[in-house]
């Protein structure tokens, strides 16, 4: 099995990692993780993942590198990966608003990239994920990335030209629906309904 590296170990990365583990009999020995938070690293180590000390180390020791950081952190992360990402590696971006071209430009590399828009129901294994691969991804890596998300819901490959609409409909809307449902429940509780 190819090594899959995660830069960032927040809620979404953790959900993806748990989905991968569920597909692999609970094993996490093929998963490498780096996060700036020692607490998150400790949690990943307890799950059985290989915790590394830098983003660069993740890139050097992983065939597929998942960028699971907030969009505002991309410039710094991409800069730190410039010397370790090659065209032999596949980069997966799960940040809203970050295009394939942006990732390649930041890395100064024409590596395979998969732009992904998961949504929060992925945390409950009920996600709907849109994936957009670059033209130079191998069939093997395309299948691996698809399966990373298929274990936690449904997946669909789309053209990158539709990604902004997908972000609005699929990526952001579940949070608003949750907020609306919570407001309804709070209202009922305030009316004495328990």
Each PLM stretch: what is its role?
Residues 102-112, 128-166, 176-194:
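Internal alpha-helical scaffold of NAD(P)-dependent oxidoreductase catalytic cores
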């Amino acid at each position: 099995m190819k090594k899959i590296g995660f830069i960032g170990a927040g809620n979404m990365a953790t959900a993806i990692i748990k989905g991968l583990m569920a597909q692999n009999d609970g094993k996490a020995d093929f998963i490498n993780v780096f996060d700036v938070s020692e607490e998150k690293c400790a949690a990943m180590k307890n799950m059985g993942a290989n915790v590394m000390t830098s983003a660069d180390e993740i890139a050097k020791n992983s065939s597929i590198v998942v960028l699971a950081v907030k969009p505002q952190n991309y410039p710094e992360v991409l800069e730190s990966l410039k010397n370790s990402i090659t065209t032999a590696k596949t980069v997966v971006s799960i940040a809203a608003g970050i295009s394939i071209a942006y990732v390649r430009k930041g890395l100064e590399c024409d590596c395979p990239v998969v732009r992904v828009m998961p949504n929060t129901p992925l945390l409950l294994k009920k996600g709907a994920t849109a994936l957009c691969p670059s033209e130079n991804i191998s069939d093997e890596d395309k299948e691996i990335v698809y399966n990373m998300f298929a274990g936690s819901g449904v997946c669909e490959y789309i053209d990158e030209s539709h990604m902004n609409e997908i972000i609005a409909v699929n990526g952001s809307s579940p949070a608003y629906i949750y907020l609306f449902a919570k407001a309804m429940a709070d209202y009922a509780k305030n009316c004495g309904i328990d």
